[in-house]
Amino acid sequence: MINYKKTDLNELDQIIRCRMEFIREDTGPQTPETEAAIQTQLQEYLKNHLNRDCFVFAAEEDEKIISIAFLLIQEKPANPRFPHGCTGNIMNVYTVPEKRRQGIAGNVIKQIMDFGKTQNLDFLKLKAAPMGYPLYKKLGFEDACSRCKEMEYKWELKND
C-alpha cells in the first residue's frame, strides 16, 4: 500500500537518495567529487530548511520513498500578482522508474497543492520537463505568461 505524506528529518537519507537519482537522470552522471559536494550541501540545507521554507512531500511503499517533490516557499514584497507576498516553487519531482505512469507523482503534487492552499500561497510555479508537462496540465497548471522574460546570470567558477 502506498502512503502519501510530508517528510521530516527522519527520512533525510531517503530524500537525498531520491534527489541524487533525480540529478543523475536529469543531468547525467557526476564526478564522485561533485556528488559528494551536492550530498554534503543537501544534508546541511535540509537540516536548516526542511519544514520551515522547504517542504518535501513523498509517496512511500514498504517504508521506502518511491516518489518525491520539493516545495520551496518564498516570501517577498506583495504586488497585484501575489497580494499575500508568498509563492511556492515546486521542484525535483521524481518517481522511481518502476513506479512511473501509475498516478503516484500526481498524488504527490496534489498533496503540495492542498498544502499550498492552507499556507495562503498566491500561486505555485514549476519548470516542467517534457515527461512531466502532460501531468501538470492535467492537474490544472497553465503555461506561465509574463511580460517579463526569465533571465539568469552565472559567475564563472574558478578552481583554486
Positions of PLM-derived features:
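A short beta-loop-alpha structural element at the N-terminal edge
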Residues: 3-17
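Conserved GNAT-fold acetyl-CoA-binding loop/helix
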Residues: 23-45
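Conserved GNAT acetyl-CoA-binding A-motif
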Residues: 109, 116-128
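Conserved catalytic-core motifs of GNAT/GCN5-like acyltransferases
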Residues: 73-79, 125-127, 131, 137, ...
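Conserved acetyl-CoA binding element of GNAT-fold acetyltransferases
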Residues: 81-97, 149
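A short helix-loop-beta-strand connector motif used in the catalytic cores of GNAT acetyltransferases and
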Residues: 44-58
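Conserved beta-strand in the GNAT
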Residues: 58, 64-73, 89, 94
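Conserved acetyl-CoA pyrophosphate-binding loop and the N-cap/start of the following alpha-helix
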Residues: 99-111
